[in-house]
Amino acid sequence: MSRLLLTLAITTTVGSLLSSNPAAAQVLPPAKRAERVEITKGPELELATDHLTIIRWTTNNPGGSDVHYGIVHYGTDRKDLNQTAKSPIRLNQGHPYTMFRVRMERLKPRTIYYYRVASEESNGKSDGVKSSVNTFTTPGPGERIVAYPKRD
């Protein structure tokens, strides 16, 4: 009898785990794209070493495709941003904004770099936002700049 009860308990538990839960099975529709996408914070330096830098910025766009890309065009000549770094970001449909972080590698120490940020959907369609040209300087060998989170 106890073996029968144990089998029944296991079957009921497994069955309830495998049965579909209509509420859990619902997939949220994509969030609505902002009418006019704008950079609301940044772009700003997050971290810099002699050979890599992370730039971060936030836009007011929570929607469109689920995956977006943060893009940084950069170079050592303000008029020739001939290098590109790109990082994917998965949108959080519950947030009214998207924060991008892009890592640029193989930089030279003690060098001034110019950069401009942009973002696009996974299909390559631009969000229509592009920053002005900004600048940062990489520190010397073994040095590091941590600009975020800000320290008081």
Positions of predicted regions on the chain:
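Bacterial N-terminal signal peptides that target proteins for export
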Residues: 1-9
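Short, surface-exposed linear motifs at loops/turns and structural transition points
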Residues: 26-152
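A generic membrane alpha-helix/interface feature
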Residues: 1, 20-21, 129
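C-terminal segment of classical bacterial N-terminal signal peptides
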Residues: 14-22
